[in-house]
Amino acid sequence: PVVLGGDDSLTRNFGAGLDGGPGDPRRTLLVSGPRGIGKTVALNELEDEAASHGWIVLRAQPYELIEPLVATVIPQALATLRQQDPGRRRISGVTVSGIGGFSTTAAPGDKPAPSLIGSLNTLCDELPPESGVLITLDEVQSVNAKELWQLTAAVQDLRRDGRDIAFAAAGLPDGVASLLQHPGTTFLRRAQHAVLAPMTPAETLTVLRDTAAQGGVEIPVGVLTDAATLTRGYPFLIQLLGYHLFERASRRGQPASHDDLAAVTPDVLKTLGDLVHQPALLHLPAAELAYLEAMAEVQEGQQAVPSAAIAQQLGKRVQQVSMVRQKLIDRELIYSPRR
């Protein structure tokens, strides 16, 4: 079963922005957070919120931003709209991702290929009353800064013309911060910024309990508490652990037990390592990898590790490892609770 956990204020505020008119600042949103914190899920929720308001959702792709929007995504949205009776046209929610076989090309002698802003204006002209266009972009830190400027400039111009258009993007914190230093991203610096954080223990307990209950599996309070502690509020791990715990208890047809939790934990942590940690460590320099290994050695039983303890484990002074520590923070592989 699917149960969304955590605070829904982000989605509610965004929905209020869609109702607020073209000048509402909540219509431009940047979501950031570390790997596995739920940024893509948050974007999906924003898309669903827009669809519930009758808006069209256009998903932009980070590695090739403008051309697919103009050649594929917007034409596909227009084709979907034009299939409806103009007099009775009402959008219940259209999402176009740009991944597929729909595209348009100009035949010889045709007018020049349309621009992004021209294509968006054409789409807005076709919209029924009280509808609009939401453009979403995941992994924004991977986008070419010049193309991002083209997109945000188009959104800004359309908003100035009173068009109902919104933009929501998600990315890693330091990557987003670096991107916003680019001179072409002034518009995004004024966007609403939401930083996703780990779920609270209470939220973790609730989502594990409610998800299992929807599938007919009971997780006793003691098991819930230990499971929540293991996840540390990390959404990817909550989902992964919850899935394995639910599956094992469901097979037995009995409430989940501490034995179930102990049995699934090794596989859960291995999967976490394979899917999240291993790709992130693949090309890591030896000094940074050694720092992480030392940190893991001394962290057991602690939420955070003093830099001095890591330096001691490495046989070095704090000043000698400070640059390595900063590089790992920049890579979003570790974080400082005091930052």
What are these model-derived regions, one by one?
Residues 25-45:
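Walker A/P-loop nucleotide-binding motif
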Residues 1-27, 73-76, 83, 92, ...:
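A short, basic N-terminal segment
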Residues 329-339:
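A short, conserved structural fragment
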Residues 20, 176-229, 241, 250-255:
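Helix-loop-helix "sensor" segment of P-loop NTPases
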Residues 107-173, 181-184:
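Conserved Walker B catalytic segment
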